[in-house]
């Protein structure tokens, strides 16, 4: 299995020594997202940036893995909301990187479905262990469960 996207940037007039960081990301499904660098790196704060995209990818992967595990356990999820945070810092090598990701999911189960904290933690642990995007990142990812 493989995935492909197309990232397109087109030069445009800019002050001497500057360049426009806005670009388009086209996904295999045909959907397009307007993107830029983060505002801290002279990007457009109205567009998605790579750091947010990475954070959304790991959050989405964890959620979908969690939902699969819950479904297999016949635990009907009514709502799942995550407000993840990514921290940028310097690695030991001196390179700037996303050094810590904290997922902060809140899960609401369907009426009549009671899940204790221990079971919820186990499902999140299993989801994290099986999320291939989390497994692809070398740095620290934490799951802080909102109960």
Stretches with model-predicted labels:
Residues 1-56, 67-147:
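Extended beta-strand/beta-hairpin segments
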Residues 61-62:
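Alpha-helical metal-binding/catalytic segments enriched in His/Glu/Asp
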């Amino acid at each position: 299995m493989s995935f492909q996207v197309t990232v397109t940037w087109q030069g445009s007039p800019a002050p001497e020594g500057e360049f426009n960081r806005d670009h388009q990301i086209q996904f295999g499904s045909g959907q397009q997202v307007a993107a830029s660098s983060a505002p801290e790196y002279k990007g457009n704060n109205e567009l998605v940036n790579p750091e947010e995209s990475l954070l959304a990818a790991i959050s989405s992967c964890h959620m979908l893995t969690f939902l699969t595990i819950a479904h297999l356990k016949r635990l009907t999820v009514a709502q799942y909301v995550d407000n993840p945070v990514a921290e940028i810092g310097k690695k030991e090598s001196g390179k700037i990187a996303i050094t810590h990701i904290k997922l902060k999911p809140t899960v609401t189960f369907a009426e009549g479905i009671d899940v204790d904290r221990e079971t919820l933690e186990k499902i999140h642990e299993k989801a994290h262990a099986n999320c291939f995007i989390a497994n692809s990142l070398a740095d620290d990812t934490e799951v802080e469960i909102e109960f």
